[in-house]
Regions:
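Conserved GHKL (Bergerat-fold) ATPase module
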Residues: 1-419
Length: 419
């Protein structure tokens, strides 16, 4: 049990720590030159006996303008359930004080493990006092600086090793990038973007890679991304056939990260791979000739509105490249982002259905040469519905009874087909 605060704000709190170090000459008091890699790992195991080996660590040692020693470790997080924020132990002259260091260590660094030891941090005072204390602010800034320097050193000295660690540290770095201006400034050259081929790029490297082929008519570089690679496979492949590159952005934090990059960089615009048909992902002044007449376009439009019945989703008939799928479902970037941000912030969308646009490729042979020319109305509706279901299937939207009916109808057609 430890006491925190003073006067009316003083409270007792029970804590459970993996191990309190009572060694008279603990590792963090030694010079880094005296220590081997195994020494650091052994000390980590002493602190957290049941944890996997850490990814890397930072040895803190400064005596002016404040006194601070310690070792901070980057843990290997196996699952989201491993994320705990009370893993940094605060000591004062080697005497354990607390594991609640949120007023001393920046929030984005609370995922780190380890020990910090400083006699200059005032004890048994209110949190508001701690926040205003000049030593505490300097210590917080120093820790942030050392973490950024360590990350940059790893990136410069062992790029391949840094890339291998990125799945474990990427979310942490992005969080710091978003929440601390000084940290953002220091690590901006070490932030990595991963594409769907598993290649890593810095922000500047990626900008250089795609600028020639993915700059829109307004001079903005269009960054295409997917947050669910398997669900978006057909969209990704279609983009690749046009020579486009696609990023993998599948972490919860990536929604905020994307908007931050758009705001900071100015010449970037991010579009999820299913936010529009492939021909229109990179806006340009080029037009594709329309093969159908106005009345034929109207006929296709009415057919799909009838197939979709009471659906509130928009139907658009567009002239696209003939190799683009006959029917596609796209989810406009702005509306989808707004919905996702509201859900992230805990705002319930109730039973409101997801809004999307059904795009019919009027230049596809199945639309122009077959569907449009069918005289049997029932057969025409069945084919229109089948093409729509294929589009839903490619978006993982065909589920439940609709999926069962789709499978059964295909089995019936196969059984009726002569072999």
């Amino acid at each position: 049990t430890i006491s925190e605060g003073e006067g009316e704000e003083k409270t007792d709190r029970e804590i459970e720590v993996a191990n309190i170090i009572n060694n008279t000459n603990p590792l963090w008091k030694k010079s880094p030159s005296e220590l081997s890699e195994q020494d650091y790992i052994n000390f980590y195991k002493e602190l957290y006996p049941y944890s996997s080996d850490p990814l890397f660590w930072i040895h803190l040692n400064i005596d002016y303008p404040f006194n601070l020693t310690g070792v901070l470790y980057f843990p290997k997080i196996e699952t989201n359930f491993d994320i705990q924020k009370n893993k940094i132990h605060l000591y004062s002259n080697q005497v354990f004080v607390t594991d609640d260091v949120k007023e001393i260590v920046p929030e984005f660094l609370m995922l780190l493990h380890g020990v910090i030891d400083s006699p200059d941090i005032p004890l048994n005072v209110s949190r508001s006092y701690l926040q205003a204390d000049s030593h505490v602010r300097k210590i917080s800034g120093y820790i942030t600086k050392k973490v950024a320097e360590k990350l940059n050193d790893l990136f410069k000295q062992d790029r391949a090793g840094f890339e291998a660690k990125w799945p474990d540290i990427g979310t942490f770095i992005k969080y710091g990038y978003l929440s601390d201006d000084k940290f953002e400034e220091k690590v901006s050259g070490s932030i990595l973007l991963k594409n769907t081929d598993g290649q890593y790029f810095t922000i500047d490297e990626y900008k250089e890679k795609i600028k020639d082929n993915q700059t829109d008519k307004d001079g903005k570089i269009t960054v295409l991304y997917s947050n669910v690679l398997n669900d978006h496979h057909s969209y990704i492949q279609a983009a690749k056939t046009k020579g486009y590159d696609v990023l993998e952005m599948d972490q919860v934090i990536d929604n905020h990260f994307i908007q931050h990059l758009e705001y900071k960089k100015g010449d970037f615009v991010f579009k999820r791979i299913d936010s529009d048909v492939t021909d229109h992902l990179i806006s340009s002044d080029e037009t594709i000739p329309e093969l159908l007449t106005e009345s034929e376009i109207k006929s296709i439009e009415e057919l799909y509105k009838n197939v979709l019945k009471d659906s509130m989703n928009k139907v658009e008939v567009k002239p696209l490249s003939s190799d683009v799928q006959p029917v596609q479902i796209v989810k406009p970037e702005f509306m989808r982002r707004m919905t996702e941000m509201q859900m992230l912030q805990g705002h319930s969308m109730g039973k409101m259905p997801e809004m999307y646009t059904i795009v019919i490729n009027s230049n596809h042979p199945l639309i122009a040469n077959k569907l449009l020319k069918m005289e049997d109305n029932a057969a025409q509706e069945n084919m229109a519905k089948y093409l729509y279901d294929l589009a839903r299937l490619s978006q993982q939207m065909l589920t439940g009874a609709d999926l069962t009916n789709f499978i059964n109808n295909n089995l019936v057609q196969m059984s009726e087909t002569s072999i």
